């Protein structure tokens, strides 16, 4: 995905990120993470670099959250400029501590930027998982829509954000 972002013009437009139906992102491959400390370190480094690239991208990035967003998937949402989820029985949250894993400090700081103050403890240190409808209050999502309207709604938002003057995105 990082290579695709390199091909996006930095002076116009916007980007729309979507996952597969039912799963926006489940985060890191736990089999790879548990295979060796070196593999885990490389995966975390690559994941953080992707999140940072999205977070600092010079154009607006809209996330169409098509289902669950777990662990790195939740942090991916935190990296985007506007996040739209679908109604349904899906969960969003950072469950690393429940899996006896740590959240690397740079990723933690990125999440703290987007998550609301009343929910930072619950979302990050208590590893609370939120329903889609409840994910707006902590700051994982900006809005929720019907499943069949997700892509239409997200594309309209991406087109709208593409029309804005963008000096803030380039800072």
Language-model features and meaning:
Residues 12, 58, 80-81, 141:
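Short, well-ordered alpha-helix to beta-strand connector turns
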Residues 1-38, 53-63, 88-90:
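A structural preference for short, pocket-lining loop segments at secondary-structure junctions
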Residues 17, 29, 76-78, 135, ...:
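Hydrophobic/aromatic residues within transmembrane alpha-helices
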Residues 27, 41-48, 71-72, 129:
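Glycine-rich phosphate-binding loop at the start of an alpha helix
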Residues 64-70, 123-128:
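Glycine-rich beta-to-alpha transition loops that act as phosphate-gripper elements at the mouths
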Residues 50, 70-123, 157:
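CoA-thioester-processing core
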Residues 82-84, 122, 126-128, 143, ...:
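Well-ordered beta-strand positions
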Residues 2, 85-90, 136-171:
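C-terminal long alpha-helix characteristic of the crotonase
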């Amino acid at each position: 995905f990082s290579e695709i972002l390199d091909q996006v013009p930095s002076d116009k437009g916007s980007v729309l990120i979507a996952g597969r139906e039912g799963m926006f992102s489940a985060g890191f491959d736990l089999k790879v993470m548990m295979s060796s400390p070196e593999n885990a370190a490389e995966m975390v480094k690559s994941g953080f670099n992707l999140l940072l690239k999205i977070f600092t991208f010079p154009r607006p990035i809209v996330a169409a959250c098509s289902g669950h967003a777990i662990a790195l998937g939740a942090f991916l949402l935190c990296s985007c400029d506007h996040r739209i989820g679908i109604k349904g029985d899906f969960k969003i949250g950072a469950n690393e501590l429940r899996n006896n894993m740590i959240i690397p400090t740079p990723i933690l700081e990125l999440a703290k930027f987007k998550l609301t103050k009343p929910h930072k403890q619950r979302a990050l240190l208590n590893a609370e998982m939120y329903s889609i409808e409840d994910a707006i209050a902590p700051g994982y999502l900006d809005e929720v829509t019907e499943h069949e309207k997700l892509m239409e709604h997200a594309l309209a938002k991406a087109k709208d954000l593409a029309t804005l003057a963008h000096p803030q995105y380039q800072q």
